[in-house]
Amino acid sequence: MIDQYKHQQLQIGLVSPQQIKAWANKNLPNGEVVGEVTRPSTFHYKTDKPEKDGLFCERIFGPIKSGICACGNSRASGAENEDERFCQKCGVEFVDSRIRRYQMGYIKLACPVTHVWYLKGLPSYIANLLDKPLKKLEGLVYGDFSFARPSTKKPTFLRLRGLFEEEIASCNHSISPFFSTPGFATFRNREIATGAGAIREQLADLDLRIIIENSLVEWKELEDEGYSGDEWEDRKRRIRKVFLIRRMQLAKHFIQTNVEPEWMVLCLLPVLPPELRPIVYRSGDKVVTSDINELYKRVIRRNNNLAYLLKRSELAPADLVMCQEKLVQEAVDTLLDSGSRGQPMRDGHNKVYKSLSDVIEGKEGRFRETLLGKRVDYSGRSVIVVGPSLSLHQCGLPLEIAIKLFQLFVIRDLITKRATSNVRIAKRKIWEKEPIVWEILQEVMRGHPVLLNRAPTLHRLGIQAFQPTLVEGRTISLHPLVCKGFNADFDGDQMAVHLPLSLEAQAEARLLMFSHMNLLSPAIGDPICVPTQDMLIGLYVLTIGNRRGICANRYNSCVNYPTKKVNYNMKDKEPHFSSSYDALGAYRQKLISLDSPLWLRWKLDQRVIGSREVPIEVQYESLGTYHEIYAHYLIVGNRKKEIRSIYIRTTLGHISFYRELEEAIQGFSQAYSYTI
């Protein structure tokens, strides 16, 4: 369909029976209206031509050959005279055969049928709106029981039963023969509602605005009651409150989309265009047909049998009619979702028939295989790797991908800056990779975001915007904190990069899709940018340190060298550093390793000074100074028992991790102060 802005779009939802007829019906010049499929036939076994009013009828779905009717006559396509657009003999319209890809038909059901998606889906929309248990609704739909139709204000037989229970017990001998009399059909139609027709009547009587008001009042009453102390009652109250919220949201959605609730019960069943459910003839008289055709045949046969029984309702037993209605309901359920009734339907070779749901859903379904995942212009694809130097809103694009994506922008700037005279010379400069090309490319990329997407895109965080930067190699660099939103890791995953062209698309990417603006999960509100997988392993390696404590003995605990003595000479002693910069400098000079224990001078902490912890060892020097050694820190004092400095026992990995946290907190504090 095409919206008001002339954008092609696909919309899935409920439609009215009038809309289904409008999709299928065609008015012939003789006044006949075609569009209803009434026969389960496909092709004639002798002529191999589509059967009239069948699943491949040319009058309903259009000609098989462009401009040629079923009789073999041809007319000029697009003739002005209305009578010349249709064959006078067979009634086939002279149009292009491609109409068979989108021209629909319909089956007029002899009884209403519930749509299995809305009855048995989770949550069940029908049960939600009617505020009734799903099991009772299923029993009503499949004829397990009936309910009294409140059509009049006078007491009916079923409602009088509660008033005269004792009298009914004495009249059982006269009630049973009544159900087999011809007058029972009239009584049943007037007093009893069963099947999907009963559901349709209840849905048609609903006032959605009253449902919203009543649900809101009940929710407020439950909210005011608070907690009773009974765990079971409180749990029931919470479940009821959640149900009321969902019911209000569903009713509001029906109102906003102008959809009537009774449309969830089908009176007309749409028939797909024949090109979407083809029959293919192969060599050796082999015929390959779509499973949808067999399921449509099953529906039409059962529906025709029910229509025949209803025409002769005076002779047909009521139980037989109800049983046939149940068969029609099950046939439509199998067509829409073959697994909805337990075991799916199988053919003679024990192969499961593929229903409409099976054709649509999954990786091999119509949407993901045929409509999604196609190649588009201004896009690329590559493996993702960690970019440790990137900010959260940045991604690294390889030179090869970047120059392809931004080629037109680079050519425009080359011509604008008079670096070249025409497009051909500009392309040659790009091909020869001249230095000016990379300068202009960086200028173009500086203000132009890109979109990164990882399939499958299951929620909105599966595609996010980033500020691109040029990197060497052929892989896309990504900040590890954004991996959870994409459900990605760095074990060979690939991601697609797209370039938004219009100003509207770029503005949307900057305002709504940038990664640093999507820090919380849109579903539950929990933080989505949290360390996972590779980042957790890196933090573990960074902070694991040397497990040998300060009180370790002089023998190495390594399994491979259980008796090797540790050499405690001057070189192997734990070094002392006055600042973290000195420790980092020693690491760059390869004087210490990442997990080597060291002593780092720390600010005087009153919690340490006032601690009552007993030192492990006290070392005195010749000048009167002393060192009090504890498990995780060291105090240096002078001869006057004054504390001169404190050293903590740590590793370079812990120092690096602490510095990163400190810088992040300072940056957040500055940003928060600017907003205030």
From Swiss-Prot:
Binding site for Zn(2+): 69, 71, 87, 90
Reactions catalysed: RNA(n) + a ribonucleoside 5'-triphosphate = RNA(n+1) + diphosphate
Subunit structure: In plastids the minimal PEP RNA polymerase catalytic core is composed of four subunits: alpha, beta, beta', and beta''. When a (nuclear-encoded) sigma factor is associated with the core the holoenzyme is formed, which can initiate transcription.
Record field: transmembrane: none
Residues reported in the UniProt entry to bind Mg(2+): 489, 491, 493
EC numbers: 2.7.7.6
GO annotation, biological process: DNA-templated transcription
Compartments where found: Plastid, Chloroplast
Designated name of the protein: DNA-directed RNA polymerase subunit beta'
GO cellular component, one term: DNA-directed RNA polymerase complex
Key words, A-Z: Chloroplast, DNA-directed RNA polymerase, Magnesium, Metal-binding, Nucleotidyltransferase, Plastid, Transcription, Transferase, Zinc
UniProt xrefs under SMART domains: RPOLA_N (SM00663)
Tree of life domain: Eukaryota
Protein family: Belongs to the RNA polymerase beta' chain family. RpoC1 subfamily.
